[in-house]
Amino acid sequence: YEIRLSLVGSEMCIRDRALCDTIAYAKSKGMFVITDGKRNDIGTTMEAYATAHLGHTDVAGESIDAFGADALTVNGYLGTDGIKPLAKICDSDDKGIFVLVKTSNPSSGELQDMKLETNESVYEHMGKMCEGWGEDLMGKHGYSAVGAVVGATYPEQLGEMRTKLPHTFFLVPGYGAQGGGADDVKNAFDENGLGAIINSSRGIMCAWKKQGLTEDDFAVAARKEAERMRDEIVGCIGKIKLG
């Protein structure tokens, strides 16, 4: 379950309360919760972000979760100085991060596709850095706590990055409302059909509109669309596993 921080609320106290309540509710239902905050900073400021979103805070001698998400989207443009504080929390609290690598928006190529002196693109180099940052945070299934955001709207690059980043779990936006489909996301998965989370926000939240229903039918429509999405993607993963 991904929570887009910018849409939770504009008033800080209301937003923070809503974020805490939403995360707590989702986790009570057994969901893995990702906060889409795209945080980036360095030093003590990033330590504060990391602690707030993923770690524990001491209050009157008691250690409590601030927000308590399982993972956080982050911007790696500040380099290792911005990732180290997050990696520390990932290690101590069994949490994860997803670094922006090749994003789904139309103008992402203005910077991310630029070629470096090594003849690799900026997004390829960022992906390589994710692999390096995750070397000491490897899980039992071969994936590290440092994941990558790679968009479904660029299926060719998505497939290339899956091959180049064998230990990096992908968060894949762009499915649904942004135009990505099951055939576009299938290459995000490894040979076992693992290694990726496919995200659809508006496609599920606004499914009642597409289905010609009313706001009162929001939950029914959202469930129906989520199940349709699941079946469609699983069908494509099956094709991969069968050759």
Name each region found by the language model.
Residues 1-14:
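Short, small-residue-biased leader/transition segments that mark boundaries at the very start
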Residues 28-30, 93:
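Helix C-cap/helix->beta junction micro-motif
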Residues 15-25, 42-48, 78-91, 153-161, ...:
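Active-site-adjacent beta->alpha loops and helix N-cap segments on the catalytic face
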Residues 152-199, 203-207:
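A C-terminal functional module that forms or caps the active site or interfaces directly
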Residues 10, 38-42, 75-77, 102-106, ...:
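Active-site beta-loop-alpha junctions enriched in small/polar residues
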Residues 41-146:
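Conserved anion-binding
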